[in-house]
């Protein structure tokens, strides 16, 4: 039930982002009396989405300064991923370790054949093998569910909306009131849209990210057959991230943070609509309910 609801919610949220983008395009066309800008943004959006999607693994791994690892360097990580990928009938992803004590993990890649899973040094030291299995099951399901495509589209459209809103603000100020022709519309409406559209795009993008996390929690726990292992891991990761947070001033890390299993930055100042991840307490409660209901089918154990 949750899975179908979350899938529909993701589609509706992506649709909402395109509605915002079209509204900006309509406003720019009215303010400048030139509809060519709509086509320009559409082409740029498609190219940006394609580049981000095709190179998602390289961009994310590079941003975390991660290095590839062998079975000898990370035997537990390698063995768990090998077992789970075999149980899921999927190819083995490439494995990386990021040199930071902040406990976290993420998966990236445009499809299972070009996937990568990265753990930080901190998470490998913090979790026991059962908890690590829960985390890796979660990350593998992001790849199998094609979440990278969803997040790439959302990020690209959000970026285009921000750029388009800046252009709309300029057009509304300098181009909205020329002559006696009122076809350009009210410049105040354009200014209001220019200010609110990027905020709306960000809220929608973050809502999509939170929705995909819930799905990966559920599907990953079904793959491992152990929802409580992931619940225990999330509890430890939240505490570890508070003790060893990542740098919020590092833009590359910020751009990758939505891929991570938990918020890598300290504190809970950002709440509600502006969370990159669902509240850890909510995720743990769902996993505990899943365990009580007997959810999960043990795999590769």
From Swiss-Prot:
GO terms for molecular function: metalloendopeptidase activity; zinc ion binding. GO terms for biological process: proteolysis. Gene3D superfamilies: Metalloproteases ('zincins'), catalytic domain (3.30.2010.10). Zn(2+) binds at residues 138, 142, 213. One of its GO terms (cellular component) is plasma membrane. It holds the Pfam family Peptidase_M48. It is an enzyme of class 3 (hydrolase). Its EC number is 3.4.24.-. It is a multi-pass membrane protein. Its cofactor is Zn(2+). Binds 1 zinc ion per subunit. It is found in: Cell membrane. The chain crosses the membrane at residues 11-31, 34-54, 154-174, 188-208. InterPro entries: HtpX_protease (IPR050083), Pept_M48_protease_HtpX (IPR022919), Peptidase_M48 (IPR001915). The active site is at residue 139. Keywords: Cell membrane, Hydrolase, Membrane, Metal-binding, Metalloprotease, Protease, Transmembrane, Transmembrane helix, Zinc. Signal peptide: none annotated. NCBIfam families: PRK03072.1 (NF002839). Belongs to the peptidase M48B family. This is Protease HtpX homolog. The lineage of its organism: Bacteria, Bacillati, Actinomycetota, Actinomycetes, Micrococcales. The gene is htpX.
